């Protein structure tokens, strides 16, 4: 019996990941490269069978002169296939790491464009899994970093930055349906090609006489992934190929799931959200004695998840500084990491937002306006939502009993009318429900 072809494998993958009741509309992120163009053709054939409407999006990062023409190539292919297509343009502001900024910008743009669509297909392949495994192995990653990328992953991009695209930049026919009133924020990345090899997808495209673009940066040894790709080719000659590495990463994913289950159990017993004056502070309190009694791996997982939860960061902190912070915490000290601060206070460890990371951030309050990735004041239009800071702290003459100490209170969310403090519910200023906490998804499945 012959092996199933790419279309049959894609249908099986989609059935496993999203079936049997498929959504009526699904988005595809298509760059124009071989992997994503193969996914477009595979999804086209699959969608015609299952009656699913596809919405295709390309993010033009503007980093190469050819990028606009490549996006137009994708748009032309979509027109020929009969699917709506939108090009979203991202421009780097020069701040931070370029690749990280491009990734975050891409997700934020897609999130604003997707409307009510809940699923976006991405074209990561088995080669991507193997290359990522080798890259992280070279950095000394543990189970967390070496585990295979998830076939489904919930994403909730930061929404406190100014909108990077205007509605009129997207043609009406390329705008997906609007979200419903009960739709939760964020979307799911779905990766149906993790079992496919890059070379097989290009063979599929050649058979179809399909078009794709080879990004010249894929041959630039200045990029770590390009060097890793060449290393993988040499390893395959010695019998250590992408299939073996991807299978190892998948086994480590199962080990990670077991470790996460243990961390969830411990966190439920020893970690609690902090409140003051009947309002959430956005901080976490960890029982010192209970936390100290569990195994190191569980401690690290809980601490990493706590830092992610408090900072709304999409990724956990790096292993080495995380381990150093844990040692200081267990010895009664503390420190800063991942935009957070940790301090030992009596019988608890307090994990709170680092004021220095928030000092220069603010947003105009109002419905749908999120500050620091998790705070909203829908009924306070016209006011500014920002950190309390030393200036706001000084305006509160009587500090309530049991309130967070000054070093933590400076990072509390507050509403201002220019320089005048209007509300800081966690310190008894204004109504307790003046601000609402919309925490991100549970990091590593550990809910607080």
List where the protein language model places each region.
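A general alpha-helix detector
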Residues: 133, 227-231, 247-248, 302, ...
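AMP-forming adenylation/ATP pyrophosphatase catalytic core
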Residues: 3-12, 17-34, 55, 90, ...
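Inter-helical turn/loop segments and adjacent helix faces that build the functional surface
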Residues: 235-245
